[in-house]
Amino acid sequence: MFERFTEKAIKVIMLAQEEARRLGHNFVGTEQILLGLIGEGTGIAAKVLKSMGVNLKDARVEVEKIIGRGSGFVAVEIPFTPRAKRVLELSLEEARQLGHNYIGTEHLLLGLIREGEGVAARVLENLALDLTKVRTQVIRLLGDTAEVSATNGQTKGKTPTLEEFGSNLTQKAAEGKLDPVIGRQKEIERVIQILGRRTKNNPILIGEPGVGKTAIAEGLAQRINNRDVPDILEDKRVVTLDIGLLVAGTKYRGEFEERLKKIIDEIRVANNVILVIDEVHTLIGAGAAEGAIDAANILKPALARGEMQCIGATTLEEYRKHIEKDSALERRFQPVMVGEPSVEETIEILYGLRDRYEKHHKLVISDEALSAAAKFADQYIADRFLPDKAIDLIDEAGSRVRLMNSQLPPAARELDKELREILKQKDEAVRSQDFETAGQLRDREMEIKAQIAAIAHSKKGDEENTKEVSVVTEEDIAQIVAAWTGIPVNKMTRSESEKLLQMEETLHGRIIGQDEAVVAVSKAIRRARVGLKNPNRPIASFIFSGPTGVGKTELTKALASYFFGSEEAMVRLDMSEYMERHTVSKLIGSPPGYVGYNEGGQLTESVRRRPYTVVLFDEIEKGHPDVFNLLLQILEDGRLTDSKGRTVDFKNTLLILTSNVGSKVIEKGGGGLGFDLSEDQTESQYGRIKALVNEELKQYFRPEFLNRLDEIIVFRQLTKDEVGEIAEIMLKEVFTRISEKGIQLEVTARFKTHLINEGYNPIYGARPLRRAVMRLLEDTLSEEFLAEKIKEGDTAVVDVDDDGKVKVLLGEKLELVAN
């Protein structure tokens, strides 16, 4: 019998057992069932009793008057009294007479009244209730609910189970609760055609997440409500089924199947329901315990025979993973592909939705903001789909503008802070019974509240006088895109414009020489930030080639630090780690079946997380040649597909490849035959070296790879003067480190000249200088530290004697070059 009970009826029985325990009785009688009915609170029985003035407290008093309290010993299993069992049987009979195939709280109450001789009936009589009137009221309420469901659903038959686990979209459309559906005429027409079939009349909407599959079902409901459909669909109602709610609370075996069968039977009898199941793949496996059958198999016969019309919606991936595997289920559904709308169609959709969002956020959304949302979403948000991502931009921009404009003025915020402090002090004064202080604080509290109210009122008055309405502009959309992706789309401030114009100067503070490289990188960044770059290619792609130790990797670090915030704000791939052929998979992720398949690739995952960044392929020639094949798509189209089939967008990255190809040529000096008659010998030598390096690159890299690069930049060898400037930078770094230990360090001009002579090597660049600083300065100082010759607070001067030996002098002031 209990399998027919509704969840509310089961709750009543459980509450009845609790009442028995509370009173110390080891049985459940009619009086406990009555207390359970009142205590349940939400069922028809509880509503009827409440409307007639019965409450739980009074009922408990009456029950205790009649039967008193028990011994206190209560068994775990509490049996029903014969009279209570009789009530349950009568409630089943009442349900049958009313044509219901379930037992609810209303049937239990009718059973109690019909039994008429138990303690429950006496309690109701003692509470001045007429049992006949209670019965009439229950039946009337049952009739009303049936009528309400009939009128709301335009139904011929009653569908209580479907209404419990579903949501009527046609009714929502009539109440204006659905967003308007713009476009999608072809898809809706195709859905209507499939619904008009005699058998297998079940369309399934397949498309990427966020393209508007559910919106098509809502569009159909709106059309039915507007009578803009063929006559075969005119009286239909569209009901969306909640699979989660259907499964929830099914504690016992067969309960889920029974619910689903009831829904199928109700739809078959009503014959005017179009069932919508969003995320239709959840049917497969839903409710399937060990040995039980799942929802999909229960629905199959009804779907094939045309007894029920069902619209499913799922993504391409889930369709392939779940439904295509079950060919018997697949043939019952007719696929309708829902593609991503174009930018123009998205703008139309946004125009249609504008009123709803303006009403919600209480502001105005400009036409430029709508166009910008569609264009920016398409260009900068790669891993989601239109129109969903564009709608999200509008929604969040509206929220941002509203919150910014609804904030209190600074004066009111200060007062609010003071008010909180006064309230805290007042509470403490009351607790310590210092009522005089509490009274003074209360007066101050009233003053501050009045001041805050006056400021808020004047702000509101100013807004009303100026008739200013908050407006969402293109700039607001750009701010949201920047917050989501890190790509600066918003208009440049004057300070940022100046920063970009002075970029070469700033980079030269760290990179000595190498004008060509610094200028090329700066131009690329400016082009991208102003928005003049090709939107389908990366910001720029360079090969930095040339001798070792001249600043190729350092320039990339300086760029990341200056423009992207920190040296770490770049994706750095040391190609020496990709020397074997199979390590290429580390870039885009392991193929299926291999270890690490679910982890994604180092390159693709980094760029997906941070789409606006510098990507550095360091020492490119050390990697396996197959790595270069991967780079072809990135360099040309700014895209790469990872091992899971996801397209990663490289259109907002700056690609830099460093290489030492040609360093042997540079080592030889690039000298030509005959006399050098040019005025500038250095320039002609650089020209020859550049030509030779380009030839070497052509021999090493494929032409289709080199042809895709924006520029091949050959770095110059460092002159002695440039090494002197680099020495200044390195010495400053040492001074900073040693000043943290409380020591002031100075070097003489003689030491500096000696350092440059020791560290200058045109073939190896600045690295010998770094070694010279370490050997001559850092090693000497560390020995002095350990010998405790230098202590905190000292001023140390580093010099060299005539033999070239480094000396550390304390407190002596010599001719200083660097501080």
Curated annotation (Swiss-Prot):
Residues 2-144 form the Clp R domain. Residues 416-451 form the UVR domain. GO terms for molecular function: ATP binding; ATP hydrolysis activity. Residues 80-144 are annotated as: Repeat 2. Residues 472-663 are annotated as: II. One of its GO terms (biological process) is cellular response to heat. GO terms for cellular component: chloroplast. Residues 162-409 are annotated as: I. InterPro entries: AAA+_ATPase, ATPase_AAA_core, Clp_ATPase_C, Clp_N_dom_sf, Clp_R_dom, ClpA/B, ClpA/B_CS1, ClpA/B_CS2. PROSITE patterns: CLP_R, CLPAB_1, CLPAB_2, UVR. ATP binds at residues 207-214, 546-553. Residues 5-70 are annotated as: Repeat 1. Keywords: ATP-binding, Chaperone, Chloroplast, Nucleotide-binding, Plastid, Repeat. It is found in: Plastid, Chloroplast. May interact with a ClpP-like protease involved in degradation of denatured proteins in the chloroplast. Belongs to the ClpA/ClpB family. This is ATP-dependent Clp protease ATP-binding subunit ClpA homolog. The gene is clpC.
